Amino acid sequence: MWREIVLKYSIMENKKSLSQIEQDLINFWDKEKIFEKFLKNNLSRAKAEKKTFSFFDGPPFASGSPHYGHIMVSFIKDAVLKYWSLRGFSVEQTFGWDCHGLPVELYVEKKIGIKSKKDIFKLGENEYKSIEKFNEICKNSVFDCIDEWHQMFKRIGRWGDFKNAYSTMDNKYI
């Protein structure tokens, strides 16, 4: 399989841009379910040997776009998780999102131009409806940010269980 990829993207023959090669690789990983196969193989081997490695990955705030610092930390965390997985340990790779109030609220206030708390009360027909509307905008903003982060993680090759990700606003988590 690896040889096939290397031959397909030989420098001499390749007419594709780096971004197209990147997208082809992401599509290949998704189509062939590479992470799922890796995880299944790793977990079955680790269960037999009863070896686990615990790693508590502090979840990022879902309140904006990832920046260079997030990407660097992700490389380090991913390297640690892959290292211990390849050493035969069971490594849980579940993602989580910190969605607690203040960072999300500040992000949304800046995004929609709210200058004071009084501006929030102008969003609806009364105070209750206004706060409800603001909370809905914040919640939708969190999902937008999570989608953006997920795409970034895929682009840098960071593996993780995104399907079973938790968020601090889920009742199951609370």
Model-derived features: positions:
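N-terminal, positively charged nucleic-acid-binding surface of large information/translation enzymes
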Residues: W2-I174
